[in-house]
C-alpha cells in the first residue's frame, strides 16, 4: 500500500507548532492530502494533544524566548510518546535561532529536518552563501546533507534546485524545481507539513521523506504550468493539484 493510500485510510492527525506567517497554508496542505491538521500555542494542553497526534511538526520561523518552553515540551513529549518529530529550522544560521536549535537538540531527538542549503549547511558546521529563508545557490553537491545527517543522526531534506534527501549513508534526489516555490512565502513550510504527514504513516522515515518531497515537487511543476505568468495563483493551484493527485490514489 502506498503512503498516500495509508494517509487516506488512516487520516493521521498532525500537530503543528507553526510560525504566525503561514499557519493557514500549513493547515490547508495537510487537509488537502487527506490528513487532519492541529495547531496549538498552549503548553497546558500539549500532553493530551501529542498523545492523540500521529506526528509533530515544529517550525521555528517566529519562535521567541517566551515560546521556547512550548516548543521544548512539544518536542520532549513527541520523543516520549514515540511520535515522529519533524523540524523546520527557519533561518537557523541567525545567532538567536541557532542558540534555540542547539538548546532543543541537547534535549530532544528530531527524526527529520527539512531546510534550504544554508540551513542544512549550519547543521553540517559549514558556511553557505545563502541568506535567511531564501535559497540562492545551487545545492547539487550532497556533502552538506550527508554530513548534517551524520552529525545529527537524523534524516535530512535539503531543498534547492535539486532536493537532496540523506540518512548519512545514502542519498536520494528530487529534481522538480520551480521558481514559484521561492517567491510564494510558505511553500517550504507546506513541504515540511507534508513530510510530517508522510512520516506519520511510515516506519521508513528516509523513504517517507523522499516520497513526500517528490510528491510535493511534482505537484509544484504541474501548478507552475497551470498558472503560467500569474504567480499569485500558484499556491491555490498547488493545493488543487495535491488534492487531485491524492484522491486519484485508490
Swiss-Prot record:
UniProt superkingdom? Bacteria
What pathway, per the record? Cofactor biosynthesis; thiamine diphosphate biosynthesis; 4-methyl-5-(2-phosphoethyl)-thiazole from 5-(2-hydroxyethyl)-4-methylthiazole: step 1/1
EC class: transferase
Q: Where, in this chain's numbering, is substrate bound? A: 39, 186
**UniProt keywords, alphabetically:** ATP-binding, Kinase, Magnesium, Metal-binding, Nucleotide-binding, Thiamine biosynthesis, Transferase
**Named cofactor requirement(s):** Mg(2+)
Question: What are the GO BP annotations of this UniProt entry?
Answer: thiamine biosynthetic process; thiamine diphosphate biosynthetic process
Q: Which reaction does it catalyse?
A: 5-(2-hydroxyethyl)-4-methylthiazole + ATP = 4-methyl-5-(2-phosphooxyethyl)-thiazole + ADP + H(+)
Q: Where is the signal peptide?
A: none
InterPro entries recorded:
Hyethyz_kinase (IPR000417), Ribokinase-like (IPR029056)
- GO MF entries: ATP binding; hydroxyethylthiazole kinase activity; magnesium ion binding
Positions contributing to ATP binding: 114, 159
Per the UniProt entry, the Enzyme Commission number(s) are 2.7.1.50
Q: Which NCBIfam families match?
A: PRK09355.1 (NF006830)
What family does the database annotate?
Answer: Belongs to the Thz kinase family.
Give the function comment from the record.
Answer: Catalyzes the phosphorylation of the hydroxyl group of 4-methyl-5-beta-hydroxyethylthiazole (THZ).
What is this protein called in UniProt? Hydroxyethylthiazole kinase
Q: Which gene encodes it?
A: thiM
Amino acid at each position: 500500500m502506498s503512503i498516500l493510500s495509508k494517509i487516506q485510510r488512516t487520516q493521521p492527525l498532525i500537530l503543528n507548532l507553526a510560525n504566525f506567517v503561514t499557519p493557514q497554508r500549513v493547515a490547508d496542505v495537510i487537509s488537502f492530502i487527506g490528513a487532519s491538521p492541529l495547531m496549538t500555542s498552549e503548553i497546558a494542553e500539549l500532553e493530551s494533544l501529542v498523545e492523540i497526534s500521529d506526528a509533530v511538526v515544529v517550525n521555528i520561523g517566529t519562535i521567541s524566548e517566551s515560546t521556547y518552553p512550548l516548543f521544548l515540551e512539544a518536542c520532549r513529549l513527541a520523543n516520549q510518546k514515540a511520535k515522529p518529530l519533524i523540524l523546520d529550522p527557519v533561518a537557523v544560521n541567525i545567532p538567536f535561532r541557532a542558540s534555540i536549535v542547539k538548546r532543543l537538540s541537547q534535549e530532544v531527538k528530531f527524526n527529520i529536518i527539512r531546510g534550504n542549503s544554508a540551513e542544512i549547511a549550519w547543521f553540517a558546521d559549514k558556511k553557505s552563501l545563502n541568506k535567511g529563508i531564501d535559497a540562492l545557490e545551487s545545492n547539487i553537491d550532497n556533502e552538506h546533507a550527508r554530513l548534517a545527517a551524520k552529525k545529527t543522526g537524523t534524516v535530512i531534506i535539503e531543498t534547492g534546485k535539486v532536493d537532496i534527501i540523506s540518512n548519512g549513508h545514502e542519498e536520494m534526489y528530487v529534481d522538480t524545481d520551480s521558481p514559484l516555490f521561492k517567491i510564494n512565502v510558505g511553500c517550504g513550510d507546506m513541504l515540511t507539513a507534508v513530510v510530517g504527514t508522510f512520516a506519520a504513516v511510515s516506519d521508513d522515515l528516509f523513504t517517507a521523506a523522499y516520497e513526500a518531497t517528490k510528491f510535493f515537487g511534482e505537484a509544484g511543476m504541474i501548478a507552475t504550468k497551470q498558472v503560467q505568468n500569474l504567480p499569485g495563483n500558484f499556491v491555490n493551484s498547488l493545493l488543487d493539484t495535491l488534492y487531485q493527485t491524492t484522491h486519484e490514489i485508490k
